[in-house]
Amino acid sequence: MNFIQEKDAKKKYIFDWWPAIKKWPEAKVEAHLPEIVAVPESVSEVQEAVKYAYDNNLAIVPFGGASGVLGGIVPEKPSLTIDMQKITGVVEFDQDNHFITAYAGMFGRELEDYLNERGYTTGHYPQSIDLATVGGLVATKSAGTFSSKYGNIEDMMQGLEVVLPNGELFTNRNVPRSATGPYIPNLFIGSE
């Protein structure tokens, strides 16, 4: 896993499409830089980075496509930014059951193109499809142009895998509807 500690290299990790930050003086920008940026290349490295942040009392700021418009990637306290862009691609595509598993760092357009090449679609076309990652689409509980036909992102999901604050991996199982308690994935869907 690579780590970024140089001040100038860390600046890109606090800029998204939020217009206010573009007017900030340099001193304010520098005051909001993360302590460190982790660039993992596997889920196990994401777990290591999250555990490091947990052990060192650092807030975690995930960095995907930087497509946000409200400055959500700007740290407000000592933080570790985790750049998810190298955790990308399709894990599995089950054409018989119309089920695809993709990593959080895969861009929405890449996922859609992958499916289109095989005669399928997600039917999910948010305005940010070219800028947002799968993880970002889930974290913002994304909706899109064809949501009235295909549903929102949460309607398309059958499961998710999440790294918890202590570095452990949580995987929900796809089970029939249950009345035995809350639907745990909803703790993460729309969590931005």
Regions found by a protein language model. Name each.
Residues 1-51, 68-98, 127, 150:
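N-terminal flexible segment immediately upstream of the FAD-binding catalytic core
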Residues 55-56, 76-77, 156:
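Short, well-ordered loop/turn elements at secondary-structure boundaries
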Residues 89-93, 98-192:
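FAD-binding subdomain of flavoenzyme oxidoreductases
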Residues 63-67:
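Glycine-rich beta-strand-to-loop/alpha-helix junction loops that act as flexible
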